[in-house]
């Protein structure tokens, strides 16, 4: 196993300090309204979330960012950032993506990797100086600059994000740890289809409408009590 593969594991680890644990991406609204309240409803929520929301937003954006970085196309990366800013409707989720992207960049720079000094990764960060970077975009650029195969990068990202959703369900509904592991492993059969679909999508499909998730994300802003920032 090469060093770059260990870095891939590291940036997708739940302990990587980008603050992802602080965000439920609207799940908290579903739980407070009693829509997601047990294992069965959690399974339905997670399946729909990864197939119709995560796939066409973060996962597709990571792929597009990877491809643009691979071509050293800085203008395409900057356009993708602006497109995501305009297309992601819930305010809290836009802010979450910015914060996690900023923390990702700062952590990578402190690791002392050579990619933090030259190349498209540095050009991209310099061009976005004073502006936000989306977590999924900077992740794609990082993986391209590290020459991590795109399929591996997207697979690890999909697993990590799904695991985070399951963890939020376990903590907030709440569910048992065993139920959480069963929910997570139950998603594996969907992963191959999701990844194939994302590889066949274009920029026009980015942030494909998922109104239910958007509405719950917006409603989260007005919840009386909250454990999560989004």
Task: Report each predicted region and the residues it spans.
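Inter-helical turn/loop segments and adjacent helix faces that build the functional surface
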Residues: 30-40, 111-118, 146-153, 172-179
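Internal, conserved structured core segments that host functional sites
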Residues: 59-64, 68-143
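C-terminal auxiliary extensions adjacent to catalytic cores
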Residues: 160-230
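A short glycine/serine-rich beta->alpha loop
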Residues: 8-17, 46-52, 86-93, 122-129, ...
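Glycine/small-residue-rich interface belts in oligomeric ring/scaffold proteins
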Residues: 4-72
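A contiguous pocket-lining binding segment that forms or flanks enzyme active sites
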Residues: 125-173
